[in-house]
Amino acid sequence: MNELFSIAGKVAVITGAGGVLGGNIAQHFVQQGAKVVAIDIRQEQLDNRVAELKQYGNDVIGIIGNVLDIASLEKVAEEVVAKWGQIDILLNIAGGNMPGATLEPEQHFYDMDISCWEKVTNLNMNGTVYPSMIFGKVMAKQKKGCIINVSSMAA
């Protein structure tokens, strides 16, 4: 039964891996023997996270990627397939919030900053759809793969 749910040797692409949630999940995957591709748009956070993850295993690479940029995601997919030959798991974790897109208890819905709301909605919706399209295409060619979408209260 344990082999059925094992991720050992699986190639897992994790968006938002430089953040707390993505980083913690990436750590768990590395500890379970997965090959982890940590993706984040923030270079410093990504570098720090990859260094931390390598304490648990060497099958970790960090790639700068923007979940809202199809060309960036296609490049990541090509790099991953070139290195490990497959993509087994996509974890869509990148997302978040920003000031102005949420309401304080005393604020009204009509007081919300529309431009902030649109940016947050774009990140949290399209930032899940675009990676799913690009990495899902690789998985479809392989005839196997798993896409996991994760969100938080901040999103």
Where are these regions (language model features)?
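Active-site Tyr-X3-Lys motif and surrounding loop/helix of classical short-chain dehydrogenase/reductase
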Residues: K75-A82, A101-D111, S115-N122
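A glycine-rich helix->loop->beta "capping" turn
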Residues: I7, Y56-D59, E79-N92, M98, ...
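Canonical Rossmann dinucleotide-binding motif of NAD(H)/NADP(H)-dependent dehydrogenases/reductases
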Residues: F5-V37
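The beta1-alpha1 cofactor-binding region of Rossmann-like NAD(H)/NADP(H)-dependent oxidoreductases
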Residues: Q43-E44, I64-V76, I114
